[in-house]
Amino acid sequence: MNRLKKLKKIRLHREGTSILIVSAILLIGINALLFWGIECKIPFYIFATASIVVYLLMVNFFRCPIRLFEHDTEKIVVAPADGRIVVIEEVDEHEYFHDRRLMISIFMSIVNVHANWYPVDGVVKHVDHHNGKFMKAWLPKASTENERSMVVIETPEGHTVMARQIAGAIARRIVTYAEVGEDCYIDEHMGFIKFGSRVDVYLPLGTEVCVKMGQATVGNETVIAKLK
């Protein structure tokens, strides 16, 4: 399968545009009121400093680095997100496969890039969203009880892989771009999760694991597994 690049050369993710604009207007407005409305400037200096720090953290959260996987993608599974590996185990998957699968989970802290990439090349076979709870994303039951979206992909070699985006205690919005029937490729964005979350990848049993527990991952760069 030929790899189709549909990248946009942006440095901030589109999901953050409205939030950053509204936040900038509010912070500037409040700082202006403090500067012009209060004779003592100490509150203004304190709030202005805090505003800059908070806004820079928001910009950092919505940053969108442009990454290209430079190697052959055949049978390769790349990390769909920045973060760290919190689960590597065989589990019974009941929502789509209804069989036993190898699950690799990546937890994203609030300081990680929150754009999500497709973990494999292939065709999108199924997309679904489930409403749910907002427990801490690293808890095992968050995978099946929290709000989540699943994207099932069939690779050119016939393997079926699922990527599940999971909302956490802070993350309250999952954005998924995948559509059933469309081709998808490593290097393309699969979606975005706002403010702390997790992504589970479900793979066929016998898949070679290329990461270890606690290992840091870089989305679209770290190879987490190789399909047989």
From Swiss-Prot:
GO terms for cellular component: plasma membrane. Binds 1 pyruvoyl group covalently per subunit. InterPro entries: PS_Dcarbxylase (IPR003817), PSD-A (IPR033175). It is found in: Cell membrane. The active site is at residue 197. Its cofactor is pyruvate. Keywords: Cell membrane, Decarboxylase, Lipid biosynthesis, Lipid metabolism, Lyase, Membrane, Phospholipid biosynthesis, Phospholipid metabolism, Pyruvate, Zymogen. It comes from the Bacteria. Its EC number is 4.1.1.65. Is synthesized initially as an inactive proenzyme. Formation of the active enzyme involves a self-maturation process in which the active site pyruvoyl group is generated from an internal serine residue via an autocatalytic post-translational modification. Two non-identical subunits are generated from the proenzyme in this reaction, and the pyruvate is formed at the N-terminus of the alpha chain, which is derived from the carboxyl end of the proenzyme. The record marks 196-197 as: Cleavage (non-hydrolytic). One of its GO terms (molecular function) is phosphatidylserine decarboxylase activity. It is an enzyme of class 4 (lyase). The keyword DNA-binding does not apply. Belongs to the phosphatidylserine decarboxylase family. PSD-A subfamily. Heterodimer of a large membrane-associated beta subunit and a small pyruvoyl-containing alpha subunit. Catalyzes the formation of phosphatidylethanolamine (PtdEtn) from phosphatidylserine (PtdSer). This is Phosphatidylserine decarboxylase proenzyme. It comes from Phocaeicola vulgatus (strain ATCC 8482 / DSM 1447 / JCM 5826 / CCUG 4940 / NBRC 14291 / NCTC 11154) (Bacteroides vulgatus).
